[in-house]
């Protein structure tokens, strides 16, 4: 309802539920669903699309990270096989599919944290390639920001705790 009212009123700053201000949740999910409503019209399908795209982005990012981290001496078929298997397992896991089909902020939080941690992994393990390391740092910062916009400070706290625990 909040994204629909954002689209109808044109006010993308103040979330409203039945005409009343509604600041119970951060705005990222509202913005993504509202943008989808503007592009595809107001429908259940358009409401679910942003979460599905977020889930899909993590699957492809995991695939790409596994290819980037594969040893150079390993055969291409082994690299592709491992990356495909891991990304496929994530893509077909019931929890990932279930949250990816629903229009709730939990998938935006999970995707933001996952992409941030994948960015950290890229920056940490690819020190030999400066551009990949920089890309990892940018991804870490960008997707921590997305996670904060999706669910609040927990979007920064969880990746931070994981990284501190790892280091």
Annotated model-derived regions:
Residues 1-167:
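Membrane-integral, polyisoprenol-dependent glycosyltransferases
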């Amino acid at each position: 309802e909040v994204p629909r009212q954002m689209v109808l009123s044109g006010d993308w700053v103040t979330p409203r539920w039945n005409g009343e201000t509604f600041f119970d949740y951060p705005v990222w999910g509202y913005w993504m669903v509202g943008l989808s409503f503007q592009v595809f019209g107001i429908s259940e399908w358009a409401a679910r699309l942003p979460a599905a795209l977020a889930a899909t982005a993590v699957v492809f990012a995991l695939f790409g990270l596994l290819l980037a981290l594969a040893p150079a001496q390993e055969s291409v078929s082994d690299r592709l096989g491992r990356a495909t298997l891991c990304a496929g397992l994530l893509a077909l896991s019931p929890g990932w599919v279930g949250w990816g089909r629903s229009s709730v902020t939990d998938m935006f939080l999970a995707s933001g944290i996952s992409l941030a941690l994948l960015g950290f992994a890229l920056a940490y393990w690819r020190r030999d390639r400066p551009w990949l390391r920089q890309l990892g740092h940018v991804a870490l910062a960008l997707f921590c920001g997305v996670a904060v916009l999706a669910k609040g400070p927990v979007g920064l706290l969880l990746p931070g705790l994981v990284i501190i625990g790892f280091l």
